[in-house]
Regions:
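Periplasmic c-type cytochrome electron-transfer domains
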Residues: 2-456
Length: 456
């Protein structure tokens, strides 16, 4: 009943606003009509220059526009919520262990690959490559940043993991990434970090019996490692899985501390909210302000890139060209199937969450044309420093990205969610100028951006 009352009140408010807008000529038919978007932006459709009433300055904003700008500010980013599936996610001891593991190349058979190999702190936790490349072998996708992803519900470009800790595990056994095995990783961590591990998780299992716990065993494609894994008892596989999950939870505890920093845009948003024209003009050029206006106006960028992290966290097909020699990537349509089958998902036995807390997984949409070729919407903070772009690294710079959005070619297969921007060169340049104002280094304790003192 309370929901019905709230809904009724909301509907009444909407009707009152609509009547007011119609009566003032802001909406309705004919030449005097305008869309709700035009009310917010002062513009008249895609491709046209955003205008200010009476020739006002570039920094003149309506109350509604100031509200939109404020909604994008990092000041509106809520405190990081706990991860119910990771009971040690905010433990200082887990952060310290995860910090060590993140930079430890011992978590690869040849000692050449660590998490930081691809997620490099001095590159905003990316690697600057078109495709992630390990041991001179390309992976199928571009390396995304981990900055601020603790706020996400889904991980990887296709969302095939539903927690940071589950995501941290997959590369450990991927042949073209770390390339290790579950038993080898468990044995390595319990050997090198025994006291640190037990400080977080309590007594560790005894893995010294090599008949029960083979040196190389895992549910992977390698036939020898797979056969060894299958031959283990269910209880012993469970013991290994528990240690393996705890490795991921430690790395996730570290990653949760890597958050986006305050940018020039955020200072501008504060000035806009205060309607401080002098301060706004000090912070943004007219071109940058025009780019901001295009971003939430004619560009409709906030349809997907909204909120303080500039992402809705969802998945969309944007009709990217298929690189020569590559196969079509199913994206989210395959990722949904993988996450529901993942032994380390929120509903699994290695999760610390109650079933009720796993809302996203319980109500996941696993079928639909809109999932075909759809990939996670990346956040845009510090976007100028994270080229190349898109899940396959196909665009070398922001100019190339905007050109693609300007034309918005149809997707095949699947359905593209884009509508052509049809921006002029000046508008494209203004939009890019705005995106550059989002640049800012990660916000994290300085010591977490470097390998732990004394590590190899």
């Amino acid at each position: 009943m309370r929901r019905l009352l709230v809904a009724g009140a909301a509907l009444a408010l909407i009707l009152l606003i609509a009547v007011a807008l119609i009566s003032t000529g802001l909406v309705g038919g004919g030449a005097v009509g305008a869309t709700i978007r035009e009310v917010f932006t002062g513009s008249a459709g895609r491709g046209g220059a955003a205008t200010r009433p009476g020739g006002a300055s570039a920094h003149s904003w309506t109350d509604a526009e100031r509200g939109l700008i404020a909604s994008l500010s990092i000041d509106r980013l809520p405190p990081l919520p706990p991860d119910p599936s990771n009971a040690v996610g905010d433990s200082p001891d887990a952060v310290a262990l995860g910090h060590a593991l993140f930079f430890d190349s011992g978590l690869s058979p040849d000692g050449s690959v660590a998490c930081s190999t691809c997620h490099q702190p001095d590159r905003y936790f990316t690697d600057g490559k078109v495709l992630a490349n390990v041991r001179d072998v390309d992976t199928p996708r571009h390396t995304p940043t981990i900055v601020g992803i603790a706020y996400s519900d889904w991980f990887y470009w296709d969302g095939r993991k539903d927690s940071q800790w589950a995501q941290a595990l997959a590369p450990q056994e991927a042949a073209i990434e770390h390339g290790g095995t579950r038993t080898a990783h468990a044995r390595y961590v319990l050997s090198r970090y025994s006291s640190e591990y037990e400080a977080v998780f309590g007594p560790a299992p005894d893995l010294s019996d090599t008949l029960r716990f083979p040196a190389e065993a895992a549910p992977v494609e390698d036939e020898t490692a797979l056969a060894a894994w299958v031959a283990m008892s269910e209880a012993d596989r469970g013991a290994i899985n528990r240690v393996f999950a705890n490795i991921g939870k430690s790395i996730a505890a570290y990653s949760r501390r890597i958050l986006p920093g305050r940018s020039r845009f955020d200072d501008y948003a504060a000035a806009a909210l205060a309607n401080d024209g002098t301060r706004m003009s000090e912070l943004f050029s007219p071109q940058e302000a025009e780019g901001l206006r295009l971003f939430f106006g004619d560009g409709q960028c906030t349809d997907c890139h909204n909120g303080p992290l500039f992402t809705n966290g969802s998945f969309h097909n944007v009709g990217l060209p298929l690189p020569e020699g590559s196969k079509f990537d199913q994206g989210r349509s395959l990722g949904t199937l993988q996450v529901v089958e993942d032994v380390f998902n929120c509903l699994g036995k290695y999760s610390d969450a109650d079933e009720e807390a796993c809302v996203e997984l319980r109500f996941i949409k696993i079928e639909g044309e809109e999932l075909i070729g759809a990939f996670k919407v990346p956040g845009l903070r510090n976007v100028a420093e994270t080229a190349p772009y898109m899940h396959n690294g196909t665009f070398a710079d922001l100019d190339a990205v905007i050109r693609h959005y300007n034309h918005a070619p149809p997707a095949f297969p699947g359905h593209s969610d884009l509508v052509p921007l049809a921006f002029t060169e000046e508008q494209s340049a203004a939009l890019i100028a705005f995106l550059l104002t989002l640049s800012a280094p990660a916000d994290a304790p300085p010591e977490l951006l470097l390998p732990p003192e004394g590590s190899e």
